[in-house]
């Protein structure tokens, strides 16, 4: 199948400057290798892409001159997907419990749908989904304000403008609670549904697998450190981050 669309790539010039470029995936010399074999979310722009003398447009430019809120934008995309997974977990859990016929002698009601402990689990899952959505929406609204600011001020660079850097900081603040809430929701739902919820035809495991895969794409372990470093030492988030060599 012929690829379509575009891919954002980075390349290093002869002077050591890292440049950003958007490549047409139908251009000559592009080879896409479908080698992403993660156990969850498939459409995460993962996998290998090779380029051989591939032509690009003339707007090649250093990464620090890209739109300043770019990293925040990509992260919000992942967070929105996570929030959607959490919501699906809540809806699926409620639907499954409403249809569950069997209960246990140690239960609290004649039917699972009336068992107060199981209803509590459903409520907790729904609360986790709500939290993931609300936090993501708050960060997205901040990012929208920043985008309008960038447009009005002719694309300020991230490392030159604290307003743009603070948008990245707010997204960093959102990452861990959204991930935690989503992973908790996609795990806890099984507590309300019993062993039958693990039936392969229900595929409820996909929710956790997708969430876990998304959460691993941009290491969240660093996000809290970045926030703490700003609060204690006043250091803004890094201008750009990617897979590469860590600075000492």
Name each model-derived stretch.
Residues 106-114, 145-167, 195-213, 242:
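Charge-rich, acidic-biased intrinsically disordered regions
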Residues 163-200:
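Charged, glycine-rich active-site and insertion segments that engage polyanionic ligands
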Residues 38-133:
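Glycine-rich beta->alpha junctions and the first turn(s) of the following alpha-helix
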Residues 96-104, 139-154, 189-192:
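Secondary-structure edge/capping motif, primarily at the C-terminal ends of alpha-helices
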Residues 84-87, 123-130, 172, 176-183, ...:
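Generic structural signal for well-ordered, non-transmembrane alpha-helical segments
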Residues 1-31:
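A short core secondary-structure module
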Residues 124-177:
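C-terminal structural cap/anchor segments
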Residues 191-248:
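Glycine-rich phosphate/cofactor-binding loops in nucleotide/flavin-utilizing enzymes
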């Amino acid at each position: 199948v012929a690829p379509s669309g575009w891919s954002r790539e980075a390349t290093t010039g002869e002077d050591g400057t890292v440049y950003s470029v958007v490549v047409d995936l139908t251009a000559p010399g592009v080879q896409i290798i479908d080698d992403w074999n993660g156990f969850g979310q498939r459409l995460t722009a993962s996998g290998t892409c090779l380029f051989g003398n591939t032509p690009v447009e003339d707007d090649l430019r250093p990464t620090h001159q890209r739109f300043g809120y770019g990293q925040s934008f990509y992260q919000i995309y992942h967070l929105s997907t996570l929030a959607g997974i959490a919501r699906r977990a809540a809806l699926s859990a409620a639907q499954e419990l409403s249809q569950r016929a069997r209960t246990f002698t140690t239960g609290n009601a004649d039917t699972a749908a009336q068992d107060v402990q199981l209803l509590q689990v459903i409520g907790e899952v729904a609360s986790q989904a709500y939290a993931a959505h609300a936090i993501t929406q708050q960060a997205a609204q901040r990012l929208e304000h920043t985008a309008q600011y960038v447009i009005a001020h002719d694309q300020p660079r991230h490392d030159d403008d604290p307003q743009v850097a603070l948008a990245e900081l707010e997204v960093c603040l959102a990452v861990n609670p959204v991930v935690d809430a989503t992973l908790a929701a996609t795990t806890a739902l099984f507590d309300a549904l019993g062993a039958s919820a693990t039936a392969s035809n229900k595929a409820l495991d996909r929710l956790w697998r997708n969430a876990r895969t998304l959460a691993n794409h941009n290491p969240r372990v660093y996000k809290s450190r970045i926030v703490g470093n700003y609060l204690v030492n006043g250091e803004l988030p890094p201008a750009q981050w990617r897979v590469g060599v860590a600075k000492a």
